[in-house]
């Protein structure tokens, strides 16, 4: 929704309670329009027989052109169901991926290591309705360690907030001695196929991630505007909740620069980068009202 909100007007009166139902209908129609668009990029690598078992869901392949390509390792190929996603005026701000399977946890950490990821965002529970949605790829107790190949991941500190947890991890490549300090943000109050009950809580989570990312001392290439340490975002399938986080982050950045909430164009662009993502109108609407809450809480 390309909705203008001048910084000189009262943002708190931008959408009144009586207007919300009308806005929801507009957003629903916008989403229907987006879903009618055809995104014709190949997914051949994802659909190869040898790689299908690495996809958590068989109907969720990733595009070939922007997939994360892992280094060839002994006995392993270069495939992971993960996509590079652009941010606002920034190439590859995100890696958007599925929740790891047990057999792809090593691939997950290889992607973290090769792209020097410093912030991981997890928007799923490990189990929901007695089904595994994400393999627990890190240790949930302080001073505990798990090893995948040459990569050792130590849990240093866990801090709990009202609606999310932040875990400080230390990743060490035992072959090279390279060490990465990583912040792992876990938000578990967004059910698969639904939306959180409170936009304020999720907005707090998004802003906490943005603050942590801003503190990482990793440069952006001035020529290509490529982020050299992308934020890795995952849910279970990596198709709705994880892309929704990306959309909200992008819209916040765009609003901060130009005072508009360009939801439609942002989602349309993101669907060209992560296959079949953001297919639910309820989540599209949630993205808008989360960004709107940011607008309302920002001095005009």
Swiss-Prot record:
SUPFAM superfamilies to which the protein is assigned, alphabetical: (Phosphotyrosine protein) phosphatases II (SSF52799)
Top-rank taxon: Viruses
Domain Tyrosine-protein phosphatase residues, every copy: 27-294
A molecular-function term among this protein's GO annotations: protein tyrosine phosphatase activity
One Pfam family of this chain: Y_phosphatase
PANTHER family to which the protein is assigned, alphabetical: RECEPTOR-TYPE TYROSINE-PROTEIN PHOSPHATASE, TYROSINE-PROTEIN PHOSPHATASE 1
Family: Belongs to the protein-tyrosine phosphatase family.
Protein's UniProt name: Tyrosine phosphatase-like protein J1
Species lineage: Viruses, Viruses incertae sedis, Polydnaviriformidae, Bracoviriform, Microplitis demolitor bracovirus
């Amino acid at each position: 929704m390309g909705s203008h909100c001048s910084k000189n007007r009262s943002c708190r009166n931008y959408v009144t309670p009586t207007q919300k139902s009308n806005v929801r209908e507009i957003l629903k129609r916008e989403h229907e329009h987006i879903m009618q668009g055809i995104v014709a990029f190949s997914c051949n690598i994802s659909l190869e027989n040898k790689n299908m078992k690495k996809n958590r869901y068989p109907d969720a392949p990733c595009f070939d052109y922007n997939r994360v390509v892992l280094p060839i390792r002994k006995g392993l190929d270069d495939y992971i169901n993960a996509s590079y996603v652009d941010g606002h005026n920034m190439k590859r701000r995100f890696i958007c991926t599925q929740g790891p399977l047990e057999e792809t946890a090593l691939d997950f950490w290889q992607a973290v290591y090769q792209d020097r990821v410093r912030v991981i965002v997890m928007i799923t529970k490990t189990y929901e309705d007695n089904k595994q949605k994400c393999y627990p790829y890190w240790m949930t107790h302080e001073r505990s360690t798990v090893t995948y190949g040459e990569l050792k991941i130590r849990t240093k500190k866990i801090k709990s907030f009202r609606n999310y947890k932040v875990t400080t991890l230390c990743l060490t490549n035992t072959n090279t001695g390279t060490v990465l300090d990583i912040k792992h943000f876990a938000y578990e109050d967004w059910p698969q196929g639904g939306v959180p009950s409170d936009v304020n809580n999720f907005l707090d989570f998004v802003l906490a991630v943005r603050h942590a990312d801003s503190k990482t001392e990793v440069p952006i290439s001035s020529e290509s505007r490529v982020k050299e340490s992308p934020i890795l975002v995952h849910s279970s399938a990596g198709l709705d909740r994880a892309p929704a986080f990306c959309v909200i982050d992008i819209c916040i950045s765009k609003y901060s620069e130009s005072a508009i909430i360009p939801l439609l164009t942002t989602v349309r662009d993101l669907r060209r980068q992560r296959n079949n993502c953001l297919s639910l109108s309820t989540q599209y609407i949630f993205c808008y009202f989360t960004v709107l809450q940011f607008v309302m809480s920002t001095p005009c």
